[in-house]
């Protein structure tokens, strides 16, 4: 749970990146971000967590979990600097998967900026990201509806064999990317009730 594939654009072209979320029980929960992330990407992670918190009931997440579990979001290859808003939906999906322990759809990658209200905004570098997805053997790609025109401008040979999901909000992303099925050996996300003497 909590590992999702994103698509990034770099100076040397497109690449796939993985977003990993892990949870640990804590008396003073906090959000930790690692992987050499720039300020804009850090803001995306904060936004994504706020969105998941605000829509906890829709995801069947007990809100008290946020008060008892710390969140660690990591983007591997820490030596490579990463920035930009396009990982917003990827981070949100990673968080939702971690807090629900639901599996993430296989062979699926995504790219898109999110707003606090959950809108999915278009991002750049689409052609390069598509080529990176193809190289990695990814079949399903989720992106903003407003990026649909970019796909239509790409040579058809580049997009053959790919299925695109064009979304308008983060809930659409979750509906596509998160399976109903829980992961094997799910994390025990039970709520620790305060004992009488602590109250």
Language model regions located:
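Peripheral, non-AAA+ core regions of ATP-driven protein-machinery
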Residues: 3-5, 12-199
């Amino acid at each position: 749970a909590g590992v999702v594939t994103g698509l990034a654009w770099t100076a040397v072209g497109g690449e796939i990146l993985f977003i990993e979320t892990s949870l640990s029980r804590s008396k003073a929960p906090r959000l930790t971000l690692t992987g050499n992330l720039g300020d804009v990407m850090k803001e995306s992670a904060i936004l994504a967590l706020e969105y998941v918190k605000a829509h906890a009931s829709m995801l069947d997440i007990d809100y008290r979990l946020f008060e008892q579990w710390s969140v660690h979001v990591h983007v591997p290859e820490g030596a490579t600097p990463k920035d930009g808003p396009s990982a917003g939906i990827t981070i949100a999906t990673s968080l939702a998967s971690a807090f629900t322990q639901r599996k993430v759809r296989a062979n699926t990658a995504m790219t898109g900026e999110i707003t606090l209200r959950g809108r999915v905004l278009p991002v750049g570098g689409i052609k390069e990201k598509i080529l990176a997805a193809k190289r990695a053997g990814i079949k399903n790609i989720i992106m903003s509806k407003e990026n649909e025109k970019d796909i239509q401008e790409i040579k058809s040979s580049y997009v053959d064999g790919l299925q695109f999901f064009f979304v308008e909000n983060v809930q659409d992303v979750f509906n596509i990317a998160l399976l109903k099925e829980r992961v094997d050996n799910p994390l025990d996300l039970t709520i620790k009730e305060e004992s009488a003497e602590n109250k």
